[in-house]
Amino acid sequence: DIKNPISTVTNTKPITKTTEHVFFKLSSYQEFLKKWMDDNDIQKEIKNKLSEWLSGGLVDWDITRDKPYFGFEIPGLKDKFFYVWLDAPIGYIASHKNYCDKNNQNYLDDWTEGSKTELYHFIGKDIAYFHGLFWPAMLEGSGFRKPNGVYCHGFLTIDGEKMSKSRGTFFNARTYLNHLQPDYLRYYFSSRLTNKIEDIDLNFDDFMARVNSDLVGKIINIGSRCAKFINKDFDNQLSAEIGNNELLESVLSKKSEIIDNYEARNYAANMRVISSLSLSLIHI
């Protein structure tokens, strides 16, 4: 035990208080969550982790916090706020409604039970239980449809180290965008991203090599060379016929593999397939 605890923020001693809280009856959704995980697309590693919660029996979830607290104050309850992970996922529905309102669509077409829309969440591995237990139970209890799948990724490290502002090992998106195109980074992440729960390391030497060698040197090079020939010799007009059916068939033969890789969320495998195709085209 700490003999003389003092808050480093307020310089005062903590005291014991009695308070009332509101709970979400998560325990009532035990069987529903088991079935939902079995019927939908959840990675094996994440499913095993979530099953540990279920095997011990779910307990009801405290969804309130006392003032001072950030977030939404609960109407009718004095100095009580919703716990941030209760209201945060609801932002998915709110942001989608905002999009639909701007495009003359009804957001409920996508969020009601029986909707044909496929709904997937892509999240970090540290918030799997919020999206794999609490959120589906909330949706079930409120009559909304549930996600078709939840895909978890690992963390992003910088040159082999965890992100830390104090140590300077962090990545500022705005600074990056002030100097380089976002597609370079999208390609780099795609070339490293599999369907496993693995961290991705952003190494800038590797980033530069992959972008220059694979993206620019192979894939973009094809478009650049073709554009010059089409402009110079063919008045910017494409042929109405395929002059090399064997080449076309070799490219189309990879169609199913590419589709399967995307369905499996194995983006790195697809980048290798596409890079291999581009290399074969360069050497024609």
What are these regions (language model features)?
Residues 5-232, 239, 270-274, 279:
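Structured secondary-structure scaffolds
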Residues 255-269:
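Long, non-coiled-coil amphipathic alpha-helical linker/lever segments
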Residues 282-284:
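Conserved small/polar residues in nucleotide/adenosyl-binding loops
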